[in-house]
């Protein structure tokens, strides 16, 4: 959908906060757009504040499209409504299209900003079933925007852009009359599970590594970590794959993202980290 959006609107310059999902830049590059990377401050947990908002507004000259995320990937923080409203007001006056990626919004238990498309004609909200319903192999998502924008984007998609399998799974997800299935209960249980397991991981990681590791606040189903310990290699040796965030603009080799999974998988991760610490292997590679 991000590629279709960019092809439909053909912006000459695209604004992207850093760090953020690499798919935004990839989409912009498909039409040869200039990418304006707007760095967020680590000391503010890579979150937007009023000072950052004012700085961002000063960098909007020439930008035709701005990518935002709520919550953001790979950090997991949400955008405050007052700050987003201020930014959207500025973008609306300048006729800048804002793409708000809410693919992880369901994990927060909040409604997000879909209703704002009525107020802001240049706002596009993108969402996905893939994340919250744990169907990564089924590429199924959607966007909401003003009718004229939706029509432009639809013309950039293949005529048959959703497979029969994806259609069927999507229909079943929305069908609360299926025996043994309640979408509302599933969402409630999933949000509670992720929240409990996230707190478990944060507690255990702090207990193991203390000030050797920074854990950034997250409202999504993942945690961004910063440590000089080469976690990626040490965990890979134990059959556990985490996200090395070295290739994210605005991050570096000390950053990693871990998924918040079910309790058995999270315990397996913690046990592997305890083993690394016990054997002193965090020093084996030195600083990466």
Residue ranges of each PLM-predicted region?
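Conserved beta-loop-alpha segment that forms the PLP phosphate-binding cup at the N-terminus of a helix
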Residues: 1-12, 141
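PLP-dependent aminotransferase-like
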Residues: 7-68
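PLP-dependent aminotransferase class I/II
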Residues: 23-25, 122-207, 215
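Helix C-cap/helix->beta junction micro-motif
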Residues: 31, 93-94, 120
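Active-site phosphate-binding strand-loop segment of PLP-dependent enzymes
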Residues: 44-106
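Conserved PLP-binding active-site segment of the aspartate aminotransferase-like
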Residues: 145, 224-227, 238-277, 285-288
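Conserved PLP-binding catalytic core of the aspartate aminotransferase-like
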Residues: 195, 199, 206-239
